[in-house]
Amino acid sequence: MIFASSNRHKYEEFRRMLSDLIDLKFLEVDYLEPQGEDTREIVVTSAKWLSNYIREPFFIEDSGLFIEALNGFPGPYSSYVFKKIGNEGVLKLMNGVENRRAFFISVIALSYGRGIEVFEGRVQGTIAREVRGGGWGFDPIFIPNGSNKTYGELGDEKDRFSHRGASCRKLREFLMRFGSDRLP
C-alpha cells in the first residue's frame, strides 16, 4: 500500500504504526489540496484527484490544529501557518490568553477499487505556554488531555495519544476487517 504525501514525518509515523500489518511505501508527491474550512472535504477531494494517477490502493492524510481562543485558527491552514510563523508565532498570538483549549484533527482518505473510505481522529488538549520538546510541526506546543507533556516531549509514545494515531487505529481496524491484501 502507498502513503502519498510531501511530508516524510507523517510517513514515518504511519510506517511505525502499521509495520506489523502492511508494507507501506512512500510516494513523495505534491498534490491538489483545495483550500477550505472542512478537513474531511479537503482530503476526500485530494484523494479523488490523486486516484486519477495512482492505480493501486493508497491513502493520504490531512490534519489541523484548532485553537478555541483563536476561533479555530489555524485549522485547515495549519501547515501554511506553521511555515510562516511557526510555534513561536502561535505562542505570540496566545500571549496573555488564559483559554488554551485546542484540538488536533487527522483525516485519512483510503482510495481503493471500491471507492474512498474516510477515518478521522480527534484529540483534545491545550496549548503550552512555551516550546517544549522536539518533534515536528506543532508537536512542541500541543499537550494532549491526559498528559502533562507536549507531543514533542512524548517521542514515539505520541502515537498512543495523537490525532494521527487515532485515525490510523481506525484505518488499521478497517484493513484488518477487510483484509489489506484483498483491497482491489
Swiss-Prot record:
GO terms for MF: dITP diphosphatase activity; ITP diphosphatase activity; metal ion binding; nucleoside triphosphate diphosphatase activity; nucleotide binding; ribonucleoside triphosphate phosphatase activity; XTP diphosphatase activity
Gene3D superfamilies per record: 3.90.950.10
GO cellular component: cytoplasm
EC number per UniProt: 3.6.1.66
Binding site for Mg(2+): 33, 62
One Pfam short name: Ham1p_like
Cofactor(s) needed by this chain: Mg(2+)
InterPro entries: dITP/XTP_pyrophosphatase, ITPase-like_fam, RdgB/HAM1
Keywords, in A-Z order: Hydrolase, Magnesium, Metal-binding, Nucleotide metabolism, Nucleotide-binding
Positions of substrate binding: 5-10, 63, 136-139, 158, 163-164
Cofactor: how bound: Binds 1 Mg(2+) ion per subunit.
Active site positions, chain numbering: 62
Catalyzed chemical reaction(s): XTP + H2O = XMP + diphosphate + H(+); dITP + H2O = dIMP + diphosphate + H(+); ITP + H2O = IMP + diphosphate + H(+)
Complexes and interactors: Homodimer.
Listed name of the protein: dITP/XTP pyrophosphatase
